[in-house]
Amino acid sequence: MVIALCALMCMVAGCKSDPQKDPTNPDTPVTPVDPPAPTETLKGNIARPTWTTPTDYDYTSSMTAVLKVDLLAAYPELAKDYVLQDKDILAAFIGDKCLGVASPTDGLFYMYIVGSEGSVTLQYWSAYYSNTFVAKNAFEFQNDAHLGTVSKPVKPSFVVTGK
């Protein structure tokens, strides 16, 4: 787990004026998301979200992901404490509508994302921190897309939102 998080830290790139590319599909531009300012303390008091995947969509994509939570810059004293837990949740959203939910299995999140079109943002709730994190980048929904594999998972980077 620590190795996966370290590898993810090495892959983080800053926002540039040119559109970024989705590492799993270089032809798909990735839209940077402006994260909110970090909260005063990383330990939150946010209850486990009740995110669910709707069943009334005809189109799906799949994602295999390893998470990287960027704590080092804002919380250097806590960055070494990060722990992935079975009760953690990764969710995909288009706007404020939840379109996919997953919990970790052996350090990976296996998620089906339903929808039709739009910019997908990822949110992650940590049971350890009782806090919500948002992915630094969004991507466009594509029907039948397969983002990541067990051997090469997608590695989204997250920052704390505190909401």
Question: What kind of region is each of these model predictions?
Answer:
Residues 35, 48, 53, 136-163:
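Extracellular beta-sheet/turn segments enriched in Thr/Pro/Gly and aliphatic residues
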Residues 11-44:
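Bacterial Sec-dependent N-terminal signal peptides
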Residues 124-135:
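Short acidic/polar inter-strand loop motif in beta-rich domains
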Residues 88-120, 124:
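Tryptophan-paired
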Residues 38-94:
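Short, surface-exposed binding/anchoring microloops in extracellular/periplasmic proteins
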Residues 22-25, 118, 160:
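Non-transmembrane "mature" sequence context
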Residues 1-13:
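Sec-dependent bacterial lipoprotein signal peptides
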